[in-house]
Amino acid sequence: HHDIGKISNPSFFTENQLSEQNPHDNITSKESVEIIKQHVLDGVKLAKNAGVPERIIEFIKTHHGTNLIGYFYNKEAKLDPEIKKVDFRYDGPKPFSVEMALVMMCDSVEAATKSLDKPDNDKIDSFVETIIDKQVEDQQFENCELTFKNISIIKSVLKEKLKNIYHIRVSYSDGSN
């Protein structure tokens, strides 16, 4: 349910782009950010109209927290070093339960992993660590009861599941399978 708002502008989201054409190429980074942020508001509206329970709607609201929309921020920062990060952040709120934080981590890692070229054990391990560490550093989980032990376990599970998805097998030193 967390991404149902993408249905309002599907072609602006990578997972729905079936051709080489990217509509973001024809608009400014600031316009792109507004469209991307809008999927959260559209999702909330669609969910409310469909009678989705408020508890689920809270997950829609928090699944990006106040994360930086890094691709467009970095693109714009090259053109204008005076830009403000706040203009390139989701509006929040940040997750306020462990379950909401888990959805944020899973969504971020899953989406970003799709961009990996030839994923292998090391790339997946590094990617999961980097993405979740950025969220921790950015204080995305400050409103929920999430421990460092929880985060470590979540990272391990995500790494294992992603390796299963990409069918990455353990390499045996003696050459046997």
Where are the regions a protein language model picked out?
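Long, compositionally biased intrinsically disordered regions
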Residues: 28, 106, 118-119, 123-177
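Divalent metal-dependent catalytic cores for phosphoryl transfer on phosphate-bearing substrates
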Residues: 1-121, 125-128, 134-138
